[in-house]
């Protein structure tokens, strides 16, 4: 039921963006599993049903369901720690997601060619026995393909984690973190928020929000300064989070080259949208 309702809402947007029903189906799947959504996209791309441009654009649009997928695990931890500042942070990050989604769909509308459709996999499931059968076939296909994708991810997780651990032991991330945090804090927010940015940089955002709440309660930071510091921490956390968590998944599902390209393109747009939204908030907030 939820899948059909989400598909009904997504179809007009994906028609506008010239991305087609296959990419729309992957978008719907992303509300439940990002790995499964990427596996579906890559299968369509390998079999020539969608072009590379459709793959890249849909990968960015799928950041919208990813936002909601992870929201329940963070919202009820963050809000008690930071209260209004945390709520503003979530609002701004959501606006950033909407901004890049709108930009990508508009770009697709202007530049992308609609994929050729008409195969049996393109017909939406109906409220009939045949429709329910097609849904079960889709679920069976996901169950068949997902284990191989997960195995591919596992192959890359171990070496990447070892490499990250070695680089961390050598002090590379600490030096990079301190340098970037120092530059950003000195230019945009008070020095007192340095600890918030550094803790957020470590990709464990609960610590950053806890520090932010403590600084606000002590009167060191205002709500606005705390929100800006948390947004900066989100941006500065990209290198560590990408290496630790995202790169193994991307190169495991896609090829190493394609997975890296998708990761950099998607995260580049994410960071740009966060910077734009944060700058607007700094000016008018």
Describe the residue ranges of each PLM region.
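Transmembrane helical segments that form the transport core of multi-pass membrane transport proteins
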Residues: 1-14, 143-220
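Alpha-helical membrane-protein architecture signal
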Residues: 24, 53, 57, 135-143
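Membrane-water interface at transmembrane helix exits
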Residues: 11, 42-45, 79, 108, ...
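Membrane-interfacial helix-loop connectors
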Residues: 23, 29-61, 74-88, 177-254
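Transmembrane alpha-helical segments of multi-pass membrane transport proteins and ion-pumping complexes
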Residues: 4, 34-38, 71, 97-105, ...
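Short, membrane-interfacial amphipathic segments enriched in basic
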Residues: 2, 121-140
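Membrane-cytosol interface motif
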Residues: 13-23
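Juxtamembrane and boundary regions of transmembrane helices in multi-pass small-molecule transporters
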Residues: 46-47, 80-129, 234-285
């Amino acid at each position: 039921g939820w899948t059909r309702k989400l598909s009904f809402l997504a179809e007009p947007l994906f028609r506008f963006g010239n991305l087609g029903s296959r990419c729309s189906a992957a978008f719907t799947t992303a509300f439940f599993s990002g790995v499964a959504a990427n596996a579906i996209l890559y299968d369509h791309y390998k079999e020539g049903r969608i072009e590379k441009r459709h793959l890249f654009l849909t990968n960015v649009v799928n950041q919208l369901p990813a936002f909601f997928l992870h929201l329940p695990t963070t919202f009820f931890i963050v809000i008690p720690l930071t209260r209004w500042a945390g709520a503003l942070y979530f609002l701004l990050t959501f606006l950033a997601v909407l901004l890049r989604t709108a930009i990508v769909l508009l770009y697709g509308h202007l530049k992308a060619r609609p994929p050729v459709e008409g195969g049996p996999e393109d017909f939406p499931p109906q409220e009939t026995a045949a429709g329910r059968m097609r849904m079960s076939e889709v679920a069976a296909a996901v169950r068949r393909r997902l284990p191989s994708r997960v195995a591919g991810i596992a192959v890359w997780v171990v070496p990447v984690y070892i490499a990250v651990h070695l680089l961390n032991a050598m002090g590379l991330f600490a030096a990079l973190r301190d340098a970037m945090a120092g530059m950003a804090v000195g230019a945009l927010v008070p020095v007192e928020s340095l600890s918030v940015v550094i803790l957020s940089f470590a990709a464990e955002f609960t610590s950053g929000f806890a520090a932010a709440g403590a600084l606000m309660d002590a009167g060191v930071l205002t709500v606005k300064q705390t929100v800006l510091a948390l947004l900066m921490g989100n941006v500065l956390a990209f290198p560590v989070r990408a290496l630790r968590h995202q790169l193994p998944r991307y190169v495991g599902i896609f090829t190493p080259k394609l997975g890296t390209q998708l990761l950099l393109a998607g995260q580049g747009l994410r960071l740009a949208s966060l910077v734009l939204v944060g700058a607007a908030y700094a000016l008018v907030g």
